[in-house]
Curated annotation (Swiss-Prot):
Name of this protein: Putative ankyrin repeat protein RBE_0357
UniProt lineage: Bacteria, Pseudomonadati, Pseudomonadota, Alphaproteobacteria, Rickettsiales
InterPro entries from the UniProt entry: Ankyrin_rpt, Ankyrin_rpt-contain_sf
Entry keywords, A to Z: ANK repeat
Pfam families: Ank_2
Origin: domain of life: Bacteria
ANK repeat residues: 24-54
Amino acid sequence: MENNISNVRIHLHRKCDVNEQDIYGKTALHYAYTKRNIDIIKILLKCPGIKICIKDNDDYTPVDLICSTISSYIASSLENKIDEVDKLGETPHYENG
């Protein structure tokens, strides 16, 4: 992983466009999220001019992806803790989509 961080730093030092999109519309931040590489995400977010709301070809921004993961994680965590039943005798649950 350290090699990936070094590569990112080298590209940024060479003044590469941190917001450049590939043929799929994805930026470095999209890919850092996909790889769940928190260290690279932190480095990219410190870059002047970073745009966190660039949409890829599927209309997802890095913010969309991160928020959906956080929401799913929180919902799943809550669901695992809930053992109370409501008036209908059901436990709350989270539905995707």
